[in-house]
């Protein structure tokens, strides 16, 4: 039998901190006591250890377990990851065995793209919300994965707000324009 690298929140508990990390164990415990926690799963600390043992490569066994759990989330939520009409959005949060406040990065709204954001806007009947989610995803991904400074996005957003002094809130057209910073 292959090793289990992912656990649904419903499968874990607070005593599994070494395996699930602090956040994973706490999310599992909150789920177990009935608090309203979005459906999700935790990739184990053993998967991280294996990743480093494999030369910073995610092996096929870990990949298969992750895909299996994404499919499980799709079944539970009725949404589909990467779907343009009813997208499943996930948050990626790192969590160590020991608490390290401010040291770990987060990416929200993974699953959005240029087409899926339109589906989210239609599904929620709220284009501003959908494009704000997408902007946040692109900004976090650019910062965490691509190491693009947050300040580049903030400068562009401030320029848009200045050009449209009617509101300090970004509307959906601003968010469409702010997906990527200009190269200027």
Which sequence ranges carry the predicted segments?
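N-terminal beta-alpha lobe that positions the nucleotide/phosphoryl donor
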Residues: 1-169, 176
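Single conserved hydrophobic/aromatic residue that forms the stacking wall/gate
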Residues: 170-184
